[in-house]
Amino acid sequence: MLSRRSLLIASALAASAPTVMAQNIAAASESLTPVGKKVDLSKLPRRKVKLVAPPMVHPHTQVATHEPSVVQFEMTILEQEMEIDDNGTMLQGMTFDGSIPGPMMIVHEGDYVELMLINPPQNTMPHNIDFHAATGGLGGGALTLVSPGEHTVLRFKATRPGTFVYHCAPGGPMIPWHVVSGMSGAIMILPRDGLRDDKGKSVKHDKVFYIGENDFYIPRDANGDFIRYTDPGSAYGDTLEVMNGLIPTHVVFNGRVGSMTGENALQAAVGETVLLIHAQANRDTRPHLIGGHGDLVWETGKFNNPPLRDQETWFIRGGSAGCALYTFRQPGVYAYVNHNLIEAVNLGATAHIKVSGTWDNDLMEQVVAPSEYGDAHTSGKALP
């Protein structure tokens, strides 16, 4: 007799059967067997870390203060309806730990990442996780496919320092559908001696702001209104049709329009150095800090490569996470945007950073306040 797990996996694979990716995942899952000597990590210290919701990150040291260890995380997959704008538009979301993006994990190079991934029984479909930071097994995707009511534990060694995307990848068209339904996040693997600038000098940050950019594809009815569905499965067919048009209805930071604007703005102070981590699992994007810059930018997010200096706008390739370091020099509200301004202004890809402190007139000063254009110009008088 077929088990519930078998039926769920069969359904997912049947939907994705036409694609090579699904065939590869199925083949990998069937053919993987233990290879080589089992690794004994019993003498390594183990640390349990509680994940926190974006845009914050869990406490961490910037320079490793310990020998390599096994860092234990736990994430629960939640399928849930989520409001994605102030107009009441609803997404049948699929999430890691209930947030879009999923929480940031931070370890040091040489550590082992050990993740318990839980798929609760109230969910409706299989899920897994593909770490772009991991080596082998489709990033862990081939080893972590769990049906509702199951859990699994994956461990991999953090060998490459940088910021990396993770996402769900259950096979075929399920992959992009799960990703654009919210199932992506990021992990940061810090060098053991911390971050360094392009000249090799150690640099530190006071805060981390973690921004996950998502493109959503919400179907409309005959009147042009967004459709609200009862569960992810009922949304699948219509959503896939919109997805295949490659035109998102929403492009947002951290799960919804306005998630980090107005009263929800991020907070900083003049003199503080902030590490801005930006992840996009699906589409290219162009972060820009209006009123500021990227002092140091790891555009591809990989810390073995020297950072760029003094960037106005940087490029995050779809399927990657990059980061920028900036020290705020003026108070005020900064807009952090995707500089495809249509997506920033019309579709939602904007965040605000409110910075407190004292204004520096040497950096910028309003010489003449807005006034009627007249005598000061036509008389040829010099400006003060």
Specify the residue positions occupied by each region the protein language model found:
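Copper-binding active sites and cupredoxin-like electron-transfer domains
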Residues: L2-P384
